[in-house]
Amino acid sequence: IVASERGMELLGVTDHYSCMLFNEYTIENFAYFVNLHDWPREWHGVRLLHGCEADIVDLEGHIFGYDIVVDHGINGDTIRRSTLKEQVFHDCDYAIASIHGRDWAKDASIASTTQMYVNALQDPKVLILGHLGRAGVPFDVDAVVTAARDLGKMIEINEASLHRRDASELEVTCRGIAERCAELGTMISFGSDAHTCWKVGVSECVGSMLDEIHFPEELCACRSAAAFEGALHAALG
């Protein structure tokens, strides 16, 4: 409803798919994603995309749940053996891959963390790398931005990263990433990172920064519903 009131044409709903949510990583706990097919495709005049923000969990760029075996449905019936990640991704239009817990990357080389992001981008459902500027994991910006460009995928410039009380250092990092996206021709998204309804569609901080660096409008996937959907279908089919 908030998206409709703010004149949005398209809303991507990407709740966290992460070990942060539950102590037990079962299909029952992540049933919300399994039921995405029951969500409407339009609500109050706003078209809806179904997705998730999925955690990268190791230096190989694996996504959370890739190694968690699922052999039953949410009702307990036996199903074809698969993984939790496969079950969650099945009905997602796209995924944002991001890092939250990062102890596993503590002593990693720049080459390793860079390859981690490149590997994550190669997942068939991953469209966007999320909040790179505040992940706390150093990497080769040019290499990752170039890989995203070559795959037709996106780098997120995250509103919440620029709206924090400690945002000054993060803003420098995010600005640098955005500038390299502009210079290398890589598409960006600018997610509101809304964890509450009143922040849906909020992107003032990102918008101001992009204006300041004269970011090319044609590289902003969120400039229109048609632009985002076109980029999604070009990248993921």
Which residues fall in each region the model found?
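Active-site environment of non-heme Fe oxygenases that use a 2-His-1-carboxylate facial triad
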Residues: 162
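Catalytic domains of carbohydrate-active enzymes, especially glycoside hydrolases
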Residues: 1-14
